[in-house]
């Protein structure tokens, strides 16, 4: 278009929509026409964002969650987004753990008090040693309440029967343990208490930290329980006729090891995030199992380190 008065050529019939770009493409204008504010050109591949404008906010990715090793990829993909229910479940589990260990603390305080009275108060210790009926009646009450709480869902979930049965169970097992402790020297009882406390705390810390899932080995623990029960029956029959020291010590060591493993298993059932867990409604069951494990560890350790009066 060299002559302004001449009509535009055929190629310029629509000057707003040019037909074909010139060879080499269009270059970006260095300066926009006067009168209009400068506006940054669109970013080209390989070029950064124009200076003076904030960069766009990057997409927000969900925070990675800490999954257990049992989660598969499909479950992980379906759980990547934040769900408010996860925090609720976590709060429920934490509240459940606190409730279980508060109950266990009260049970252990009652048991330690009974053991101290039976051991350090000589008239009481002498009375329970001379009256074995106290031991057998307490043991019968212990078995009945234990089986009721462990096997019957109704009583252990119904207030106030759960508290009443658990209190009777704790007192009965405390009387049994106190009677056994009264037959040993005071020093042996104190040493057994210290060892039991160290073992119980160590197992609990280990269960909080480890990735080993003891709850996936239910069959193994059933076998251990059967072996311990059969060994106890055979040992009791043999010791009735003749006391064999090494046989007694082997049985006590086996019992201490087995109930330490049972404590780890039951602790992981309470902590959750494993293959098998206890329902938050069964806090009585959790306290019952862990408390029983600790008491049995104490009795077996007492047999190992103690000497009878």
From Swiss-Prot:
Record carries keyword Calcium: no
Gene for this chain: Tmbim1
Keyword Thylakoid: no
Organs and tissues of expression: Expressed in most tissues except spleen, thymus and testis.
Topology versus the membrane: Multi-pass membrane protein
Family as reported in the entry's similarity comment: Belongs to the BI1 family. LFG subfamily.
Gene Ontology biological process terms, A to Z: negative regulation of catalytic activity; negative regulation of extrinsic apoptotic signaling pathway via death domain receptors; negative regulation of Fas signaling pathway; negative regulation of protein localization to plasma membrane; positive regulation of blood vessel remodeling; regulation of calcium-mediated signaling
Protein's UniProt name: Protein lifeguard 3
Compartmental location: Membrane; Lysosome membrane; Endosome membrane
Residue numbers of Phosphoserine PTMs: 79, 81
